[in-house]
């Protein structure tokens, strides 16, 4: 079975590496163009490109997978199936109809819930207790195709984005093998999604990262862990936009939204609209993240200061 793999970030790269190491015949790879990344804005290859080069798999990086050059590449490698994971661009009808066995996407949510670009962050932000991975056959509508395989996991109350993403990657790797083995022998049963239950996980905007301390402690906790460690939940300390990481506890007592009540070695208790949250790390502009304890000892932060959740474009 000839496989073309389509994806871009680390999530996809780990799945691709797993397929190749397990002997699957990946005949081609499509990934997004290299882009400037990080503080230095240095152009870096996508993680999927790195894996393709390592294993000498032919790859392309088109601006659009639906243009003539990309379609010619796909036809030349002749896939039986196209596997997509976190590609970041829409596949058109010509691509979807090209492989004889279809195109399948590996999506980190329990579809039809959380269709879209940011399902991991949104399930955490919304305080969901369960999530999972869905492999479905792709159709023109975003994340709306019939389901081939779905697995569910529970979410820890203080689990961060990084931690949950890691577990979902491992689950996706296991499921990709199971799915392709079943596809190889024609043992796939597709189940239509219940479109009336669909919810959406839109692309993250800068304003989504702002912590609103007037909300209750549970909501503030969920906001911080949803963007820990990247790109980081934001607030203002005076005129400085800072990032918050490592929420470790909540308490029903306390108020004064944004007020830093108390700092110890384990973090800072910060007031919310209802209760308090304990946060371990803060990152000042242009600096590495430090514990609140280190910042207090360095006289950069003290009890009684206030964090504000305002948005400045």
UniProtKB/Swiss-Prot annotation:
Keywords tagged on the record: Protein biosynthesis, Transferase
EC assignment: 2.1.2.9
Enzyme class: transferase
Record flagged with keyword Calcium: no
NCBIfam families: fmt
Protein role: Attaches a formyl group to the free amino group of methionyl-tRNA(fMet). The formyl group appears to play a dual role in the initiator identity of N-formylmethionyl-tRNA by promoting its recognition by IF2 and preventing the misappropriation of this tRNA by the elongation apparatus.
Name of the protein this chain belongs to: Methionyl-tRNA formyltransferase
Native source organism of the sequence: Thermotoga sp. (strain RQ2)
């Amino acid at each position: 079975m000839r496989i073309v793999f389509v994806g871009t970030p680390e999530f996809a790269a780990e799945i691709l590496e797993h397929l190749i190491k397990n002997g699957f015949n990946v005949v081609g790879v499509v990934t997004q163009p290299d882009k400037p990344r990080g503080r230095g804005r240095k152009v870096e290859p996508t993680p999927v490109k790195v894996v393709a080069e390592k294993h000498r798999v032919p790859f392309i990086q088109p601006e659009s997978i639906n243009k003539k050059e990309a379609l010619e590449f796909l036809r030349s490698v002749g896939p039986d199936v196209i596997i997509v994971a976190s590609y970041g661009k829409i596949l058109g009808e010509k691509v979807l109809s090209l492989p004889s066995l279809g195109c399948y996407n590996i999506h980190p949510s329990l579809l039809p819930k959380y269709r879209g670009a940011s399902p991991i962050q949104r399930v955490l932000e919304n305080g969901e207790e369960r999530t999972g991975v869905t492999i479905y056959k792709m159709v023109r509508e975003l994340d709306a195709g019939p389901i081939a395989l779905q697995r569910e996991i529970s979410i820890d109350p203080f689990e961060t984005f990084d931690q949950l993403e890691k577990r979902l990657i491992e689950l996706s790797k296991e499921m990709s093998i199971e799915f392709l083995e079943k596809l190889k022998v024609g043992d796939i049963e597709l189940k239509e999604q219940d479109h009336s239950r669909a919810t959406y996980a839109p692309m993250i905007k800068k304003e989504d990262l702002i912590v609103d301390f007037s909300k209750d402690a549970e909501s503030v906790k969920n906001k911080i862990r949803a963007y820990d460690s990247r790109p980081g939940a934001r607030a203002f300390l005076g005129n400085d936009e800072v990032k918050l990481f490592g929420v470790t506890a909540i308490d029903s007592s306390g108020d004064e939204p944004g007020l830093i009540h108390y700092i110890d070695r384990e973090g800072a208790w910060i007031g919310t609209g209802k209760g308090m949250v304990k946060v371990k790390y803060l990152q000042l502009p242009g600096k590495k993240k430090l514990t609140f304890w280190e910042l207090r000892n360095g006289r950069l932060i003290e009890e009684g200061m206030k964090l504000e959740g305002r948005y400045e474009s």
